[in-house]
């Protein structure tokens, strides 16, 4: 039973759109080079992936003598998330937070398994209204996020556990490759 899941996941991982993964990597790299902040958000398992990506960008990419990667997750301040969710609407929990930290040159990375999470779409629209760039990670064919994001990575699956595994693998690959690039400076 367990091997069946791993075999299916391996087949799905082999179908990852590598050109899209490279585009995401390049967007994060350019953000690092201009000393911007990578701001990440998502819901549920995608919120955990957002926090994990920020952790890896903040720790795995540390190279002695080099500037640190700037990264923040809109999912990590739960009092603020719940205050905005309670006082306005859950679809506004990210769009109400981002003006506190967003600066020109920052990059928003949104993670939504379905690509249709209203709060992820709202914050993406806000960043674009400020002239900013949005990376969207999704699955299930991409949903609305795939066409909204400037750079879209759609996991080739419609099974949420696989979509989340692919997003996490992408995040690990990003951190490893960014650390290699920083070491090469």
Predicted segment positions?
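Structured helix-beta-strand junction loops
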Residues: 12, 34-35, 104, 148
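Hydrophobic packing residues in well-ordered alpha-helices of helical domains and bundles
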Residues: 2, 21-24, 50
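A short, well-structured juxtamembrane/interface segment
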Residues: 16-34
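Generic N-terminal amphipathic, Lys/Arg-enriched alpha-helix
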Residues: 1-16
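Short glycine-rich or small-residue beta-strand-to-loop segments that form or flank ligand, phosphate
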Residues: 34-44, 108-110
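Glycine-rich phosphate-binding loops that contact phosphosugars or nucleotide phosphates
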Residues: 46, 51-184
